[in-house]
Design a protein with these regions (language model features):
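Residue-level detector of short, conserved catalytic/binding motifs and their immediate flanks
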Residues: 47, 60, 105
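Short proline/glycine-enriched turn/loop motifs at strand-loop junctions of beta-rich domains
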Residues: 54-59, 112
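Beta-sandwich interaction modules
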Residues: 27-30, 34-44, 77-124
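Short edge beta-strand/loop segments characteristic of extracellular beta-sandwich folds
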Residues: 48-52
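Transition segment at domain starts
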Residues: 1-43
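Short, surface-exposed beta-strand/strand-loop-strand elements in extracellular ectodomains
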Residues: 57-78, 119-123
Length: 124
C-alpha cells in the first residue's frame, strides 16, 4: 500500500443526467462508499477531499463511518463542502482536510436541483 492513496469519491454528476447512484431526477443521493484510512489500519487518519462544482444548486457533504460493514444509517456528517441557498448557483473549487480513522467515506448530496458536481477526489 503506498503512503498516499487517491480515490474518486464521486464521478462527474450533472442534474438531469443519470449516472452512478444518481437517477437523474432525485434531489438527494449518496455516492458509493470508499475505503478510508481506518480500513487500511493507518494511524494518522488524515484525509483530503477536493471538490469542483459548476452552477450547483444543492448541498454536498462528506460522511464517514467506523463500522466495517455499515448500514446507510451508520454514516455521520464529517463536513459540509458546499451548501447553496436554494436559488443561487455556485461555481467553485473546495479543499477539505479532516482527521479520523474512518473505515468508509462517502458523499451525500441533497437539495440537488441544478448544475454539476464535476468530480470529488480523496487522498489519504
Amino acid at each position: 500500500m503506498p503512503a498516499t492513496t487517491s480515490t474518486t469519491l464521486l464521478a462527474s454528476t450533472t442534474f438531469g443526467s443519470s449516472t452512478g447512484n444518481y437517477d437523474g431526477s432525485a434531489a438527494a443521493f449518496n455516492s458509493d462508499k470508499v475505503k478510508g484510512d481506518g480500513y487500511y489500519g493507518f494511524s494518522d487518519g488524515v484525509h483530503t477531499v477536493q471538490t469542483r462544482v459548476t452552477s450547483l444548486i444543492g448541498t454536498v457533504k462528506i460522511q464517514g463511518t467506523l463500522v466495517k460493514d455499515p448500514a446507510t444509517t451508520d454514516f455521520v456528517d464529517i463536513a459540509t463542502v458546499v451548501q447553496s441557498d436554494g436559488s443561487t448557483a455556485i461555481t467553485d473549487s473546495y479543499l477539505n482536510n479532516f482527521t479520523g480513522n474512518f473505515v468508509w467515506i462517502r458523499i451525500a448530496v441533497s437539495e440537488f436541483t441544478a448544475g454539476s458536481i464535476n468530480n470529488i477526489f480523496m487522498a489519504h
